[in-house]
Design a protein with these regions (language model features):
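Short, structured segments at the rim of ligand-binding sites
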Residues: 1-239
């Protein structure tokens, strides 16, 4: 194919040529990688993401290093080790690639909810990107929003709460906050999260999270079920 303009704001494709097959490796999902790195930072842990490429999310790994995580990369993937309480980082300003991705703003915010100090987030790509904030506040987070700016002041601890996902990345942020909170949190609206993450609950459980799926019964009693048709995720200590 005759394609030009890679790396610019305009890509031109000239037709007319016979195409042939090839072998191509699809690039890894950098936002999914950022989410799992922030999960380790939020709950405190050690994670290795096979196939992840730091060059695709260097602004995220830089923020995690500044927060106190040990992040290393090799030809096979990225490792993040986060054992100590995190510290606040310099202003996080979303920008087009290769700047800080707007889709990683919410999950990094979740990772910094218990950090020492205050972190300023500035959303420069989309409007209404802080819809997850009110739900995080229900879990004990200290966040002030003014227009495009959100200031996150770290707290000593988060507590469990019933919360509702209203969008994909905000829902992922609620799941990460629930990992770090005391008690069991229930997340409604998880269909938003499932739209962008394959088996998020299974992968988090594989990392040691206590996470299960529930569906409200007609009698009003919540029952657990292993099927994929779910309305709620519960994260925390099982009763």
């Amino acid at each position: 194919a005759r394609v030009s303009g890679a790396g610019s704001s305009a890509v031109s494709i000239e037709g007319g040529q016979d195409l042939h097959g090839c072998t191509y490796r699809v690039m890894p999902d950098r936002i999914a990688a950022a989410t799992y790195l922030c999960a380790a930072a939020s709950a405190g842990g050690d994670i290795y993401l096979r196939g992840a490429e730091e060059g695709h999310l260097s602004t995220v790994t830089a923020a995690l290093r500044e927060a106190g995580c040990t992040v290393t990369a090799d030809s096979g993937g990225i490792r993040a080790l986060c054992r100590e309480r995190l510290r606040a980082v310099g202003p996080v300003q979303t920008a087009p690639y290769p700047g800080f991705p707007t889709d990683a703003q919410a999950v990094l915010m979740a990772a910094l909810l218990r950090s020492r100090g205050a972190t300023v987030f500035e959303e420069n790509i989309f409007e209404n990107r802080y819809r997850h904030v009110d739900e995080l506040i229900r879990m004990g987070a200290s966040i002030r929003v003014s227009g495009r700016v959100a200031v996150v002041t770290g707290v000593e601890r988060l507590h469990s709460a019933p919360v509702r996902c209203t969008d994909l990345r905000g829902g992922a942020a609620l799941a990460l906050a629930a990992l770090a909170a005391r008690g069991s949190s229930r997340l409604g609206g998880v269909e938003f999260v499932r739209r962008g993450y394959a088996d998020l609950d299974r992968l988090l459980a594989g990392l040691g999270a206590q996470i299960w799926q529930e569906i409200p019964a007609r009698s009003g009693v919540v029952k657990k079920t292993p099927t994929k048709k779910q309305f709620c995720l519960a994260i925390g200590a099982k009763k």
